[in-house]
Swiss-Prot record:
GO annotation (BP), single: tRNA wobble uridine modification
Subunit (UniProt): Homodimer. Heterotetramer of two MnmE and two MnmG subunits.
Sorted UniProt keywords: Cytoplasm, FAD, Flavoprotein, NAD, tRNA processing
Compartments reported by the entry: Cytoplasm
Pfam family, one: GIDA
Domain of life: Bacteria
Species this chain originates from: Symbiobacterium thermophilum (strain DSM 24528 / JCM 14929 / IAM 14863 / T)
Highest classification ranks of the organism: Bacteria, Bacillati, Bacillota, Clostridia, Eubacteriales
PANTHER family per UniProt: GLUCOSE INHIBITED DIVISION PROTEIN A, PROTEIN MTO1 HOMOLOG, MITOCHONDRIAL
Name of the protein this chain belongs to: tRNA uridine 5-carboxymethylaminomethyl modification enzyme MnmG
Entry's Gene Ontology molecular function annotations: flavin adenine dinucleotide binding
One GO CC term on file: cytosol
Function: NAD-binding protein involved in the addition of a carboxymethylaminomethyl (cmnm) group at the wobble position (U34) of certain tRNAs, forming tRNA-cmnm(5)s(2)U34.
Amino acid sequence: MGLTKEYDVIVVGAGHAGIEAALAAARKGMRTACFTTTLENIGAMNCNPSIGGPAKGHLVREIDALGGQMALTADATFLQMRLLNSGKGPAVQALRAQIDKRAYAWAMRLVLERTPNLDLKQAMVQEIVVEDGRVRGIVTATGIFYGAKAVVLSTGTYLHGRTIIGEVQRSSGPGGLAPAVGLTESLKRLGFEVGRFKTGTPPRVDGRTVDFSRMVRQDGDPEPHRFSFMSPLDHREQLPCWLTHTTPASHELIRRNLHRAPMFTGVIEGRGPRYCPSVEDKVVRFADKESHQVFLEPESRESHEMYVLGLSTSLPEEVQIELVRTVPGMEEAELMRPGYAIEYDYIVSTQLKPSLETKLVRGLFCGGQINGTSGYEEAAAQGLIAGINAACYVEGREPLVISRSEGYIGVLIDDLVTKGSPEPYRMLTSRAEFRMMLRQDNAHLRLTEKGREYGLVDDARWEVFVALRDGIEAERERLARTVVGPAPEVQRVLERLGSAPLKAGVTLEQLLRRPEVRYEHLVEMGLGRPDLDEAIWREVETQVKYAGYIAKEQQQVDRMRRMEARRIPPTLDYQALTGLSMEAREKLSRIRPETLGQASRISGVSPADVAVLMVHLDRLARARDRAEEA
């Protein structure tokens, strides 16, 4: 086994995590190689043809702010965009786009091929080579060794993949591609704990065989949206989605065939995603419901293939055909692909550091579904952080760690490395403690400076960001210092809005704080700036109106940061701390949190246990101070 080539960073996998990892490392100047089992499958969207949505849209915006690629490519290839929860507060509003999955995958491949310092390799990686506790490289199925100072594993659902359709099972990755064989055994030999999860996908139908007149049309928003503030606003023609529903006949058919459903026959052993259940699971769990929503989503401008969201299933193909035809509008639908379930191996995520480096092997990082997550956006976010930190490892630089108070990416990774997950992890807005501070509309304000610090934000992006940031600050200052009195044009607008008239002078900031007053009303009064960029005035309006809530969250953040500042020695013997509960000793010894804050979030570690740890850390600090004085 000879050395073929030496790289700084090797990325295994070219899905959504692998793409971001490879681009991040290469853009930071690392000699990078990205391995995939087939070059034709780079950036494949093997499940739903969409990006974004609640919490997921936040992740996409944060990836963009840090200098990642997903947002830019989504903006370039979308079929439809909608702002979800637009009638609710800004904390839960989220952008969701239907994506042309063919165009998206091709665009991502072009980005990779045109990136300096990045080689693409079609090969099956079977072994991780480790020497003296450090990663040394990888070996392919054909016996070729490639050296590397850091390796990122982003294998998706390919590790020992097994697809199931009714009674038919076969070793396979998603979409019928070859599974990754051998890598799981390599990880186990290195001492990693490996688990098994399951996910699934619905059938696809030929749109020419669907009667859309029996469905409810759902169009994109007429006003243009974008994930990246670097993308132009695009008024392209959008394609509609369609809403229909299952029927009592659908449910009866499923019940009659439960004895053939792998979910209920014991064929499927892996735990599936809670928030994306199969249709047979929904029928059993919600037996009183007469129907469930079904959405038909276009997959590409170049294809008639439609994704049947809501009918994820692993029932036999002949049952799937019959099932689809019980849904209004699809009585004569032709299946182009059957739905299937897929089982795959993953690494138990508590074996990772917050940097996504493994605790067992230095220089080995993991990102994406290999860490037990679900979703393109979750994968891309982890891949980006893993790629940045693989490069930092090579440079000998401190890793980038996003805290829970800085981004949804921080919440995602902290949950994984601190708590783990007994099922495929999905990002939800409810998982974030500081939702008013972590809005999707301020992701660039929160994280672009970090992206610049770590070398992924170029001069063009930085210039646009600085203009936005400075524009927001300048307008906030103007609103705070400008006083307006009860002028007739002001009183007229306030009366029309049903707002109390002014009796004395107030600042524009105080006026904008009124629930019924919007920034455009200030413009109408002659007090706003009609030429101001919409992104600036919208952010200013949000900051002013929610200042009280944001201030309360900031107090919580300050308390959390004090806890995060208390570092725990990596060699601390928890078994020797007699004040800890037995469960806390076991969990702390296994997870080995890096800070007191992380320790406090571990399931089974009580406030009393945290107090014991705090006392011990204080004792260690005093002993260290005395030693230094001596």
